[in-house]
Amino acid sequence: MAIEFPKSSHQSGLRFMNRNPHPKKERHGDCGVRAICLAFDLDYDKVWKRATSNKRNNAPVYCYSDGTGSHYYERSKATATWGLSKDDLIETLQDFNLDVVYKKTAYKEQGRNVQMYFNAGNLPDRCIAHIPRHWVAVRDGAIWDTWDSRGKRPRKLRGYVCLRSDL
């Protein structure tokens, strides 16, 4: 069911809904996990565990030498607490059987790069927007996040992740 809001006075055309799905209401760099939970109504702990697993599997394996000729290989101990890459985020959504696609919004026109902006007219009704250094859930004409990432000036939109059926 779509929620109806009055028209936003913000330059992005989006409203801000302050939401934090973290069980302890902590605020740190888990924006990818928060965005997945808020955009697709999934449980935070399940998403965090799956995203952490994907992040570790996609990370490089480190090789150490102790100086005696022995080599030790170690996998990354990174967690989803400090951000997700585009591949980690998409793989996590696919693990929940969501048929998603990343739509890049930059393109070349007459030899120069053209970048779209984080604006209601450039996004589908439900998606995860990729803005510089951040993922944010967009649903029903509003951003759903722990802080107002719309900004005072127009922000570049790198791309967005949405269901293939929403394209």
Task: For the regions a language model picked out, list residue spans one by one.
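Noncatalytic regulatory segments and standalone regulatory/sensor domains
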Residues: 145-167
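Short glycine-aromatic motifs
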Residues: 14, 98-100, 127, 154-157
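Conserved active-site-adjacent core of cysteine acyl-enzyme catalytic domains
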Residues: 59-133, 139-148
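Functionally constrained cores in energy, signaling, and assembly domains
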Residues: 39, 137, 158
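Active-site nucleophile-adjacent alpha helix/oxyanion-hole segment immediately C-terminal to the catalytic cysteine
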Residues: 1-75, 79, 87, 91, ...
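Generic detection of intrinsically disordered/low-complexity segments and helix-coil linkers/edges
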Residues: 8-10, 111, 154
